[in-house]
């Protein structure tokens, strides 16, 4: 059975492109358009990996990661998180790396716009890491 990946992003173009890239590699993809919907889909679908945009309405990626640290979500602790970010400036990148890496316990990040090869490589690495 194909691994299931949850993609959470408020940009429909990013959702469509990411879905197309991942499905071309044999992954099953489920999507959500904001953090609140993303948490609901996480609970309903129990994916093998979550790809999460940082900047979204209702609840952003930081909020989702913080929520997942609550003991109520402990069942999903082993679900790898790949962050999508538009953060480019050095100061913003340092803040991002500190907040997400140290505080929010994410596994990796990728900058937008992303190349399909980079996305596939990062996803494959995280999926294989979870399997082992």
Spell out what each predicted region is.
Residues 56:
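Receiver (REC) domain active-site loop signature in two-component systems and cognate sites
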Residues 63, 77, 88-108, 117, ...:
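Alpha4 helix (beta4-alpha4-beta5 surface) of REC/receiver domains from two-component response regulators
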Residues 121-132:
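The C-terminal output helix
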Residues 9, 53, 85:
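Active-site residues of response regulator receiver
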Residues 34-37, 60-68:
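Acidic catalytic/metal-coordinating carboxylates
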Residues 16-24:
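Charged docking surfaces used in two-component/phosphorelay signaling
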